[in-house]
Amino acid sequence: CTALTDLSCFGNQLTSLDVSNNTALNILECSSNRLTSLDVSNNTALKNLWCYENKLTSLNGSSNTALTELDCSDNKLTSLDVSNNSALTKLYCSYNQLTSLDISNNTALFDLSCHNNQLTSLDLSNNKALTDLSCSDNQLTSLDLSNNTALKNLWCYENQLTSLDLSNNIAL
């Protein structure tokens, strides 16, 4: 069905999902399954992708330029490229195995949850719209929030931070 715009198939035992012909898909919720791979390269209209609680080892969203919300938490991702997703406002990628996360092109991002990974650094200098940040349980040694003046909620516990300057974050 090429006219399909919303697909919700969460909470099953799916090991594969073929949405390659569903080019009109706006919303895909395939969370809580057993997916090891997910090809959304033909789904260029995709705005919301919820694929958390699977077994994904990789996720390529480079062709999903309309994507505003991505939840790929609780998978086995070692890398995540969101550089082409400039419309992204919400990114949830917690409980993976990410060692780095480049969100410099995601200037519309206001909600970022990247806790419980293996991040050693996190550059938020371009993310001025950020209001919510959860980066706990990583290996961060520093966290520069001087450009994130809109920040209202911050969770950064269980890292290796030695100092934290919140003087510009008056909304906290």
Located regions from the model:
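Leucine-rich repeat
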Residues: 1-3, 22-25, 41-46, 62-67, ...
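Low-complexity/repetitive intrinsically disordered segments
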Residues: 1-15, 153-172
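Generic alpha-helical secondary structure signal
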Residues: 5, 56, 96-99, 161
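Conserved hydrophobic beta-strand positions in leucine-rich repeat
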Residues: 7-9, 26-30, 47-51, 68-72, ...
